Amino acid sequence: MASEDPSVSGVSGRYATALFELARDEKVVDAVTADLDKFKAMLADSPDLLRLVRSPVFGAEAQAKALGAVLDKAGITGISANFLKLLAANRRLFVVADVIRAYRALVAKFKGEATADVTVAETLGDKNLEALKAALKAVTGKDVTLNINVDPAIIGGLVVKLGSRMVDSSIRTKLNSIKHAMKEAG
């Protein structure tokens, strides 16, 4: 299955595929998705956890021990916890963000959903998220799952990537367009 989807390839694709197939067989796809989303949010909120995940300085045993404590405190158990500990034991924890992205792509394909990567300057409210989902559903004809990334560098607006299509309505891009137009005119 990993070779069928270009977004699910390499080491992260193999791990994501194995996790997805296990979760599907055990009928816990949604629970694992929720746990991985919780872990992804924890990574975004904790520079120390991010350092633990990315740094080669920590050995596999130290990573697994620290990760076990973090997962217990967060209430992440079962297949999800065992999987994350396996990544640590195999020294592959640094690819966890790519594994989560690939896993979500597999889940979306399984459920007949589309996944859109959305970059915004600041966190969107629930009303705006629902409006964006509705607009994307109207375009694709499928339920759309949003992967939201906050990047203040885009200044305002948003960048939406859905499959091979991308719509960039960020203020940064508009300012760059004006800058290039002024250089050509002057």
Swiss-Prot record:
Give the membrane topology, semicolon-separated if more than one.
Answer: Peripheral membrane protein
Asked whether the UniProt record includes Membrane among its keywords, one would answer yes
Its function, per the record, reads: F(1)F(0) ATP synthase produces ATP from ADP in the presence of a proton or sodium gradient. F-type ATPases consist of two structural domains, F(1) containing the extramembraneous catalytic core and F(0) containing the membrane proton channel, linked together by a central stalk and a peripheral stalk. During catalysis, ATP synthesis in the catalytic domain of F(1) is coupled via a rotary mechanism of the central stalk subunits to proton translocation. This protein is part of the stalk that links CF(0) to CF(1). It either transmits conformational changes from CF(0) to CF(1) or is implicated in proton conduction.
| Oligomer and partners | F-type ATPases have 2 components, F(1) - the catalytic core - and F(0) - the membrane proton channel. F(1) has five subunits: alpha(3), beta(3), gamma(1), delta(1), epsilon(1). CF(0) has four main subunits: a(1), b(1), b'(1) and c(10-14). The alpha and beta chains form an alternating ring which encloses part of the gamma chain. F(1) is attached to F(0) by a central stalk formed by the gamma and epsilon chains, while a peripheral stalk is formed by the delta, b and b' chains.
Its family?
Belongs to the ATPase delta chain family.
One GO term of the cellular component aspect?
Answer: proton-transporting ATP synthase complex
What are the entry keywords? ATP synthesis, Cell inner membrane, Cell membrane, CF(1), Hydrogen ion transport, Ion transport, Membrane, Transport
Read off the HAMAP family from this record: ATP_synth_delta_bact
Q: Which organism is it from?
A: Rhodopseudomonas palustris (strain HaA2)
Q: What is this protein called?
A: ATP synthase subunit delta
Which InterPro entries does the UniProt entry name for this protein? ATP_synth_OSCP/delta_N_sf (IPR026015), ATPase_OSCP/d_CS (IPR020781), ATPase_OSCP/dsu (IPR000711)
What lineage does UniProt assign to this protein's organism? Bacteria, Pseudomonadati, Pseudomonadota, Alphaproteobacteria, Hyphomicrobiales
